Regions:
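An N-terminal alpha-helical hairpin/helix-loop-helix interaction module that forms a charged
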Residues: 1-45, 61-191
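Cytochrome P450 catalytic-core helices
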Residues: 52-56
Length: 191
């Protein structure tokens, strides 16, 4: 049963994030069922959205990102990415991947950061660089930045706002309204 769950999770989805979202949700549902059946609801093992995105990331880091809420929310606030990710095991994968894709795009444009990243392949600590994943898509680096920024308080000295839930909702509504108005304007200009 567990092997089949992982096979389904790792099945190619062609990059369709809606399909991937459904695969994650199905995996979590089956995992919760097994936990209730064999462990009577005692959670000895990680059984959440973070752990499942971790499995996907370890399986294929070039096409997946790890989601760790405590680190992601703080990072998103710092870069003023206020779109709604959802909560708990109901994370909106498409929104989270959009933020990560924007981060990767900015990282790839920074020559100094790319030079520093490529220096990790220089064998100075007794590890064969050929054993490293090349991280051509920079998804590993993206999570390193998100995780380390929060873990090591690299936000120190940066002024940023951590909006409350209602403020976030209002920002999201304003953004959606602005996008709607822009689309209406573009349609009107085409006529």
């Amino acid at each position: 049963k567990v092997r089949k769950m992982f096979q389904e999770l790792f099945r190619d989805d062609g990059g369709d994030l809606q399909v991937r979202q459904k695969k994650i949700e199905a995996f979590l549902e089956q995992s919760h069922q097994l936990n209730n059946q064999y462990e009577n609801g005692v959670f000895r093992y990680k059984d959440d959205f973070h752990s499942v995105t971790g499995y996907l990331f370890l399986y294929d880091p070039d096409h997946n990102y790890i989601y760790k809420a405590s680190h992601v929310w703080r990072f998103a606030d710092c870069i003023e990415f206020y779109d709604d990710f959802g909560m708990g095991d109901h994370v909106k994968l498409k929104t989270y991947y959009r933020m990560c894709d924007e981060l990767v795009k900015a990282m790839k444009a920074d020559a100094a950061l790319m030079a520093t990243d490529s220096s990790r392949f220089e064998n100075g600590w007794g590890v064969d660089p050929a054993t490293f994943h090349p991280d051509t898509e920079k998804h590993i680096l993206a999570f390193d930045i998100i995780y380390c920024s929060s873990t090591y308080n690299l936000f120190k000295g940066i002024t940023y706002v951590r909006p409350k839930t209602k403020e976030r909702q209002l920002m999201q509504e304003k953004k959606e309204k602005a996008q709607e108005l822009l689309a209406n304007l573009q349609r009107a200009q085409e006529q």
